[in-house]
Amino acid sequence: MASDVVARTRSSGVTFTPPTTHDMVRSLFDPTVRKSFLEICITLALLSDFVFCYWGLQRFGLTSMKKAFLAQYLFWRLCYNLGIGVALHLQSRYETWTNYAKRNHVFTKGNHTPLARFCQFELKTKMSEGYDMYSQPEELNVWLLFRQFVDLILMQDFCTYMIYVYLSLPAQWSAMLNWRTGLGVSMILFNIWVKVDAHRVVKDYAWYWGDFFFLQESELVFDGVFNISPHPMYSIGYMGYYGLSLICGNYHVLLVSISGHLLQFLFLKYVESPHMEITYGSESSDDNSQINSCIDDLIATKNYDYSRPLINSGFWVNNFDKLRFTDYFTVGTSLALICWLFLERPSVKLLFNLTFFTKFVTSIVVCSILYLQSSQKWFTKLYLKNGYTQVYSYQQWQFIYNFSSCLTYTLLFIQTLAKLFDDNTYIEYTQFIFGLLLCAVQTWCNAEIRSAISDFGWFYGDFFLSNYIPTKSLTSHGIYRYLNNPETILGVAGVWGTVLMTDFSWENIALACLWSGCNFIIVKFIEQPHMAKLYGDNTRVGGIEKTLQGLGPWRRMSELMDRVENVITKSLTNQQEPFDKGLEKPRKDIKSVNNHLRVRTNSQEWEEAVEDAIGNVTSKLYPDCKFEIEDLGEKSFILPRPITIRWQVPIELFDEDAWIGLYNIIQTRSNSKTTKVSSSGHWSAVSPNAYKGYESNNLAVTEFEKNDTVACGKVTFDSSLLHFKPGIYEFRYHAGNSHNVLCTSKPFELLLPNLDMETPEILNKQLLQLLTSVSAVKNGKFDSHGNRYFTTRIFQRLVKDSLGVELSTDYINRVNGDIGAISQRICHIKKVLDDLE
């Protein structure tokens, strides 16, 4: 502890300057540092452990000494977690030890009681000559003595554990020449770095729980290892336990290590965490930490029929709704599969194939829904156009996602279980326990993710209900403080745990690779692009990534990977450029125009294409023939405006059975002399009495004259003959009762009317006028039989192309074509989709 730090007592507020102190290892083993009586005793106690081990091995044998040191380790571990825990709890709540020292004047000069003499002697021998214990507050003196007992317990705890591990090593050193030793040594080295870096950050003050006694008036910068894991001294600070267990290859050591680590977590939960909340308040989160939870509440408040979704949480489910059938279906399916395993005993091969196929298919379904929802709002539109609400579509997605998760993990569970009970599978207990630990890590990771982003984030709510997000910023609290995408690695830890449990069976390796690949695809190619689009390109940097970026070699490797990614991206972009540039070249014939129109989608490019087509295509006429469209000055017609064609042909070319057809130029571009496609009823006679039985086609003839030299007339295509699909069309005059083309008009464009969606009432009025003009209204409702060319499908297309809103046939039929209800629905859908943008 630095001498320039200012501290103050917790209750009285007395300020003082703490003396310089040293860490545990230097205090005990550095010969240049003064040693107190207790420190000498601690050192002798540690040496006695080794002497006792050597003597005991000679006298009692290996098995007895392993039991003896296991008992010692358990004793000292309980002294640590229970003894120190109780002492700190009393000090935190009641300041028991400092108050005792004050009441009994333990550090008062002239007090000759045995306790006071011993405590004062201990501090005098420990501290430098310049330290005046009588002028310092009792809180500091008690803490300095408390450190001595902590040193004894912690060093004995460590020493007895290490001796127990040593006694559990394989008899043959050659048995340790494997991958487990390499991984174990790496974990031990990592553990050492964690402890050293943690002490660099918190110093002796926090290492010895100084804030239980007094408070420092300084800001600690929690960087380094504190960016990697929550409570690193209690979590990853015990990685060495598992590294030593791997090296030993003894599951007894692993179980002892797990027990010791578990006791440490209990110490954290019941001693440290409550004190932190009392002293510093609950852990502060970023301003957006509660946004997702608030969104869940907002959804439930605004939608009275909404209830929290069922969520798979390992071997249990949360939010089970007794009145929701899908919950029974999900749970029932999982239970049925487990019963099937025990009753039918399916083969391992069948279970593997079924698990692999199910995971593959459900991943495709989930990825497809998320991708289409992100790019097109497809899933929401699917339900909106069928008369359902936005939140209802989200509820259906929640069921799909959770059911897929339950189904695949249930199948993985029974597949692993069947593999374990297979006669050909060797169960190595150490690997099996490590596999269970990985499953526990995944369960913990999922719980932390849900705690950080709530149900809304767990079910990708920002894909479906982005309009419910009040502040669009990514959360950086909880597990997301350390990992940017924790589900990518820790989210499949349990799946790789099954690989360890089954002794690296190829089936479970294949399943783990599939799980990891699917997770990677969702995060890298779907989730990250969507997050960038919704929240901006300022990506969140996790604590682990931030720490690694501070390391030179890792930073250079990261820069190299970024360059490779940029090269790949640019190469893909350059391959696309020639195609894009080709679209910009002018089209000089009608075939090029149509290819051009297929690609161009926005309105400006569409208008340019129309100009290109009309400007470069002339009507094709026989000599002395006339074939003109009236009022073609604007080169376009807004539906359902009637179109009149004036025609004239020499008498020798005229035939009473001649007719005029309306075609999309994309269909007729291949042949200008013969029409090879059907007009599908979009045709008119040129003579009023030519085609008996085709009344609507004859009624289109408005003028007809014939003399000795020419025949001429007018034909008007109204809503009963026009196409209601936007595009570029042409009229063709056919000679006689054939498909031989005599005349072709100039191309023109058919456009949909612009409807006003300012209010449902205005839209209702305009729709009613439009449908009346095309004879598709009966009793104020849409009548799909009123105009054979204005069917329900055409009405859907009109609404989609003109208003950008889709309605399903089922919905239109459900409301019986009610224009008012349809108008209300269109405005609602449009508002929802606009809010999602």
UniProtKB/Swiss-Prot annotation:
Membrane-spanning parts: 37-57, 68-88, 149-169, 174-194, 206-226, 236-256, 323-343, 350-370, 397-417, 425-445, 506-526
GO biological process per UniProt: methylation; phosphatidylcholine biosynthetic process
Locations listed in the record: Endoplasmic reticulum membrane
Keywords of the record: Endoplasmic reticulum, Lipid biosynthesis, Lipid metabolism, Membrane, Methyltransferase, Phospholipid biosynthesis, Phospholipid metabolism, S-adenosyl-L-methionine, Transferase, Transmembrane, Transmembrane helix
Recorded GO CC terms: endoplasmic reticulum membrane
Domain of life: Eukaryota
Record topological domains on the Cytoplasmic side: 58-67, 170-173, 227-235, 344-349, 418-424, 527-837
UniProt GO MF annotations: phosphatidylethanolamine N-methyltransferase activity
EC number: 2.1.1.17
Known catalytic reactions: a 1,2-diacyl-sn-glycero-3-phosphoethanolamine + S-adenosyl-L-methionine = a 1,2-diacyl-sn-glycero-3-phospho-N-methylethanolamine + S-adenosyl-L-homocysteine + H(+)
Metabolic or biological pathway, per its Swiss-Prot or TrEMBL entry: Phospholipid metabolism; phosphatidylcholine biosynthesis
Topology feature Lumenal, residues: 1-36, 89-148, 195-205, 257-322, 371-396, 446-505
Topology versus the membrane: Multi-pass membrane protein
Predominant subcellular localization, coarse grouping: endoplasmic reticulum
Entry-linked InterPro entries: Phopholipid_MeTrfase, Phosphatid-EA_MeTrfase_fun
PANTHER family named in the record: PHOSPHATIDYLETHANOLAMINE N-METHYLTRANSFERASE
Functional summary from the UniProt entry: Catalyzes the first step of the methylation pathway of phosphatidylcholine biosynthesis, the SAM-dependent methylation of phosphatidylethanolamine (PE) to phosphatidylmonomethylethanolamine (PMME).
Stated family: Belongs to the class VI-like SAM-binding methyltransferase superfamily. CHO2 family.
Protein name in UniProt: Phosphatidylethanolamine N-methyltransferase
